[in-house]
Amino acid sequence: MDLLEGLPITVKVRGNWDDCVLEALDGVYGLEDPQEIQLLRLTQYLMERLDTRYIDWLRSLPLLDKIEVDGLRFSLSHNLPDKNYGGALQVTNETSNFDHLLDEETDIAVYGHVHKQLLRYGSQGQQIINPGTIGMPYFDWESLKNHRAQYAVIEVEEGELVNIQFRKVAYDYEAELELAKEKGLPFIEMYQELRREDNYPGHNKELLTSLIKKHDYVEDVKDFLQKIKNES
């Protein structure tokens, strides 16, 4: 967070994983669902390392923000303007779904969430861009799979969109994995599969249940829930 704070970022929006952290801190989750236990344990890990002032900052972020760059009007949202979760904007969905990103005051809509780079048009001709993902790329076509971090560069000159570049950058995936191990990241087995196989088994409840039992995460989470209760 300190690194992000030092960058000249002009627009920030709140994503679904941000809300998961806030919901964990607000006592929304319990000990019955393995996915909720996972979110609680990851939030606990985060809070052991994060200045609490960033939580207030996180709560203040909007779902949608707009910015004008040299006359071109951009909207930015994690997913839909009023919903930062769900599958409405999967890249092969109908154009009518993507029209929800657009209005008469938007020339270009930028969104994230689906972990895939995309350029397409709304039904009235505005452009829609997804820059992709830094650390969790999803590929349906096996030959296109790769680990590289994704981003996009949009160039505007004198009110005109002159260039869009979708980029992928390699980094040392094993070094990143070793760093996560050194820092004691919970559910490290799942992170290892993500880094090495480009597969994140986050919806595999059987795997989650086995890892929770293996590492006794329930006891960790019980202590965390009690701490949250005491501080509320």
Q: Which role fits each region the language model picked out?
A:
Residues R41, L46-R167:
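Acidic, His/Gly-enriched loop-helix segments that form or flank divalent-metal centers
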